[in-house]
């Protein structure tokens, strides 16, 4: 009913159900994460500021096929780009220099384009699982000192000795026929 052009009273004369209601949540917080890297932009794998303790170079008579980055024990490690977790090595404790062939706790990400892989070694904790899709900048682990690190966190010394991230970039599967490249070539 209208009075002087204003609606003043409404009466429901009927209703039609267009779509039945659903009494459950069908989708909660779904976000599509592409598993293919954007080769034009790579995220740095640690927070800043950081210190490079070893470069991609020869040392101690052998080639070091990665860069060692120090921020601090337990600091976050981030995926350098989108991809799929290709391998995870875990179960290592500080001081076990042979665990996972000296790599300690580690993650390898397949970036699913151009054969690019990144490796993250000597981790304290791991936040991902094999087969999981990750996005650039996503926290995947924390910095640690597992596996063969120098100085070794030996009994009676600092339990944080040798803390760093060994960050490597490969074209092809790391340690499986791939070729390592200088990580700085991406930045």
Walk through the language-model features, giving the residues of each.
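Well-ordered beta-sheet/strand-loop patches within structured domains
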Residues: 1-56, 63
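A generic structural motif
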Residues: 2-3, 70, 110-112, 170-172
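Generic structural signal for well-ordered beta-strand positions
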Residues: 8-9, 86, 140
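Acidic, glycine-rich catalytic/binding loops that coordinate metals and/or anionic ligands
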Residues: 14, 40-44, 126-138, 142, ...
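Generic structural motif
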Residues: 44-54, 75-87, 134-137
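Bulky hydrophobic/aromatic "packing anchor" residues in well-ordered structure
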Residues: 51-53, 69, 183
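Zn2+-dependent peptidoglycan hydrolase active-site motif and core
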Residues: 64-66, 79-127, 146-165
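Short, small/polar residue-rich loop motifs at catalytic or cofactor-binding pockets
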Residues: 72-73, 127
